[in-house]
């Protein structure tokens, strides 16, 4: 891993997103906030040597597992702040996990950004992630939003659920399922769609959630029963 670039992006990306989403002040207008001592915002004080080293490398490669628009905004703001070209590739969390494991010892990306936590935990346990101390980690409202060893930090959270096609349900004369248990009903056979557990981080999260919801054995049985209704 290109250490300078990886550390710099890890320290900055969440801050960049805050500027993209909740502050319309252009990046150029934010520079120089550190009492004239730096051309960068004040939270980068003392990082000038690190930034210069990253700029000397010139480019950054990012695997992004968040929404495309979110990833693009973060990378664009990073480029505006530091003048470092960002090459971003949008992949599912499971796909990134597979690439990182395949590239073990010869990584082609500097940073993994966004996605669900389960694949991050797997890669961390395999020693494939570089721990770092994020500048704003103390602002996270709970320790559950970061790895205890600093391998990853949460930048957003979401709610796991399922969507229904109301037009299709009307055509078939079916009521919409109201909870996860309803998805096992025989009338939904062949109507449930779910991503591949091996490649999609969200599908892995479904497995994790069902085990937490029902317990290990019942959770696994739920997934076995759900498989009978999944469209092939």
What are these regions (language model features)?
Residues 56-60, 81-82:
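Acidic/histidine-rich, surface-exposed loop or edge segments in extracytoplasmic proteins
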Residues 26-27, 31-32, 36-40, 80, ...:
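Low-complexity, compositionally biased segments
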Residues 61-75, 87-103, 107-232:
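Extracytoplasmic ligand-binding site segments that recognize negatively charged/polar headgroups
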Residues 1-57:
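Short, low-complexity disordered leader/linker segments with a strong preference
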Residues 22-29, 82, 106-107, 151, ...:
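Short alpha-helix boundary/capping motifs
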């Amino acid at each position: 891993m290109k250490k300078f670039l990886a550390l710099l992006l890890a320290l900055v990306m969440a801050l960049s997103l805050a500027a993209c989403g909740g502050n319309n002040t252009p990046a150029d207008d934010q520079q120089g906030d550190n009492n004239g001592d730096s051309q960068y915002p004040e939270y980068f004080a003392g990082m000038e040597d690190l930034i210069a080293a990253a700029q000397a490398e010139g480019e950054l490669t990012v695997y992004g597992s968040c929404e495309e628009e979110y990833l693009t905004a973060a990378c664009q703001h990073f480029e505006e702040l530091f003048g470092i070209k960002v090459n971003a590739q949008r992949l599912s969390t499971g796909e990134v996990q597979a690439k990182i494991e395949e590239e073990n010892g010869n990584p082609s990306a500097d940073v993994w950004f966004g996605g669900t936590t389960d694949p991050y935990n797997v890669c961390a346990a395999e020693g494939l992630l570089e721990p770092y101390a994020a500048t704003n980690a103390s602002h996270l409202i709970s320790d559950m939003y970061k790895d205890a060893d600093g391998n990853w930090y949460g930048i957003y959270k979401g709610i796991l659920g399922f969507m229904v096609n109301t037009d299709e349900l009307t055509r078939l004369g079916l009521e919409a399922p109201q909870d996860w248990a309803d998805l096992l009903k025989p009338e939904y056979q062949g109507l449930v769609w779910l991503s591949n557990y091996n490649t999609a981080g969200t599908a892995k999260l479904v497995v994790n959630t069902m085990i937490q919801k029902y317990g290990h054995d019942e959770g696994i049985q739920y997934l076995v029963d759900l498989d009978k209704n999944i469209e092939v």
